[in-house]
């Protein structure tokens, strides 16, 4: 299940509740150490040298507990008591060219600026440019705010214990946290902490989407309509359509502008492709409609934009709006408040829609989601970027845990919009639209992660082929 994003005080309360039930700190530390070692083995090869930096507190204990489980690895454990004295030891080990570092210097309890000796020690670790696994939080980072205390370890991956700490999701923390993963089965009591921000786990989708009924037919799984593609941007329509196919709605009809009709139709066999006319009546037979991918040409008329605005306001159909079409929406309530609405802005688009700057959006992404949803008909908002958010004006907001920087390539967003739309078009999946959207976002990122594990130079076409198959 999704995990609440919590603050440091809540984590301490959770730990105290666990100790009160009879669980021991030593047992939790032992389990954490075992999981740290498992991750470190996965990220290294046999006979690699792993450097472990262990501080005085429980964070250091977690790191030390990993040592006995690092089979077939050479380990250099440095117990760091004084950074000034131990810096020379660090420099000597770094000359041995370790392949990997485990950072257990400071935990979430750090609440003071680091002195110059600690800053120099951490700077030396960072200057080595080695992959670092941070235990619970990168040393030097404020787990409450995401700011650093003068310096912080730049981790490739952070394994946080129990639940993500709110500061780790702040934009300021991203360069230090790296990829954030949660160690959620380490002997702590079940978490009863309430938080509006939830961390998505793969287990959320263990039995989702549900199995198809044995007598299901094309009509059972809906008819997706797509309005996409214009001169110079026809590839976006193709990618969105192919991604929608991976979601397996019963039928897909794509309407596009006449100058790109042949270029698009020649690439799509199972999608019905039509030329755009002056109204949207063609979509009346659809069970959902995607609007926007590749509609960026200068010859998109004001008449078209106005028709889309009215469609957004008045249609009872589920609508997914992406890319250039987001700029055409008016901040307005819909006349059918029960209708499913989804918008998928990246930070730049969100900033334009909210009439604010991109840094302002990124500084408080949760607030941006709430405000976007409120302004645009209580729509579901997929605020893309690192740790994509999914939510509405009220209720929980979910942080996506999958994905990697290689998603930052042209066509990635078109693929996501198409996959979301292909799922939302299916009537059996519309009852829990939020979960359906979250699944699409997670699957999109998980597919990228699986591709990256196999091949570092994959392209969006590879991503489309993987959608629905990531585990």
Question: For each predicted feature, which ranges?
Answer:
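Short acidic loop-to-helix transition motifs that present clustered carboxylates
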Residues: 82-87, 139-143, 166, 325-328
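Small-residue (G/A/S/T)-rich helix-start motifs and N-terminal tracts that mark the onset
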Residues: 1-69, 76-79, 157, 168-323, ...
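Internal gly/pro-rich beta-alpha loop/helix module
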Residues: 98-100, 105-196
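N-terminal small/polar loop signature for handling phosphorylated ligands or for N-terminal nucleophile
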Residues: 50-51, 58-61, 65-126, 262-274
């Amino acid at each position: 299940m999704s995990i609440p994003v919590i603050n440091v005080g809540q984590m301490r309360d959770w730990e105290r509740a666990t100790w009160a039930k009879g669980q021991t700190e030593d047992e939790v530390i032992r389990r954490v150490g075992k999981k740290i070692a498992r991750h470190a083995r996965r990220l290294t090869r046999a006979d690699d040298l792993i450097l472990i930096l262990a501080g005085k507190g429980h964070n250091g204990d977690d790191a030390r507990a990993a040592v006995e489980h690092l089979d077939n690895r050479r380990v250099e454990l440095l117990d760091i008591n004084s950074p000034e004295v131990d810096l020379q030891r660090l420099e000597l080990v770094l000359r041995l060219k370790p392949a990997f570092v485990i950072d257990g210097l400071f935990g979430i309890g750090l609440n003071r600026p680091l002195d110059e000796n600690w800053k120099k020690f951490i700077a030396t670790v960072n200057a080595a440019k080695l992959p670092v696994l941070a235990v619970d939080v990168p040393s030097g980072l404020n787990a409450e705010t995401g700011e650093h205390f003068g310096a912080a370890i730049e981790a490739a991956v952070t394994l946080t214990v129990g639940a993500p700490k709110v500061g780790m999701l702040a934009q300021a923390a991203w360069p230090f946290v790296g990829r954030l993963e949660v160690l959620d089965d380490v002997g702590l009591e079940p978490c009863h902490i309430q938080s509006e921000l939830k961390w998505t786990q793969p287990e959320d989708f263990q039995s989702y989407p549900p199995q198809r009924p044995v007598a299901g037919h094309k009509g059972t799984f809906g008819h997706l309509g797509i309005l996409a593609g214009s001169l110079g941007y026809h590839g976006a329509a193709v990618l969105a359509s192919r991604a929608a196919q991976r979601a397996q709605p019963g039928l897909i009809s794509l309407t596009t502008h006449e100058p790109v009709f042949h270029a698009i139709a020649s690439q799509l066999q199972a999608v019905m492709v039509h030329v755009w006319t002056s109204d949207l009546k063609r979509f009346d037979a659809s069970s959902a409609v995607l609007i926007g991918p590749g509609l960026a040409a200068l010859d998109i008329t004001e008449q078209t934009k106005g028709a889309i605005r009215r469609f957004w306001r008045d249609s009872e159909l589920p609508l997914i709006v992406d890319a250039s079409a987001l700029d055409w929406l008016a901040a307005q309530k819909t006349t059918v408040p029960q209708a499913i609405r989804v918008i998928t802005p990246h930070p730049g688009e969100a900033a334009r829609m909210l009439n604010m700057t991109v840094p302002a959006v990124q500084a408080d992404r949760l607030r941006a989601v709430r405000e976007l949803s409120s302004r645009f008909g209580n729509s579901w908002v997929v605020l893309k970027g690192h740790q994509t958010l999914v939510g509405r004006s009220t209720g929980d907001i979910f942080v996506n845990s999958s994905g990697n920087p290689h998603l930052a390539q042209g066509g990635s967003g078109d693929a996501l919009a198409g996959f979301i739309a292909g799922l939302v078009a299916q009537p059996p999946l519309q009852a829990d639209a939020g979960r359906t959207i979250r699944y699409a976002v997670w699957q999109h990122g998980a597919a990228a992660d699986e591709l990256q594990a196999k091949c570092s130079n994959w392209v969006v076409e590879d991503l489309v082929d993987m959608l629905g198959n990531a585990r």
